[in-house]
Amino acid sequence: MSAVIGLDHGGKRIGVAVGDEETRQAFARPALLRRNVAADLDRIAELAAAEGTTRVVVGLPRNMDGSEGPQAAAARAFGAQLGTIGLEVDFVDERLSSWQAGEDLVAAGRRPERASGEKDSAAARLILQEWLDRRRPDDPKA
């Protein structure tokens, strides 16, 4: 198995997903409540070790016009921090991923406002799935 971790970086939580490059499927995992940078990095390093991977995909929240604002800068800084613990980081444009995650929860009969951790990890799954889909050999965007 060639595991990859997907992360949706947020102020209160980090959404988590794990996927497999061979099957090209991503699955949401429980979100991490943010504590402090050192603790967050430790927990992500533990997850990466448990999954046997050093590859992490981080959502990059671009503005609708494609530009990068403060949230994108924070995601890039987070990615740089992940790099300091030996993880290889890729970024994926995550415009509308949180909205889509909320829509998916509603379709599943869940209330997004009561399932914020689920929503964060559902967004991480969408981010990671986008990355996996782009790596398909028959995809011209890959």
Regions found by a protein language model. Name each.
Residues 2-7, 11-142:
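Phosphate- and other anionic-substrate recognition elements at nucleic-acid/protein interfaces
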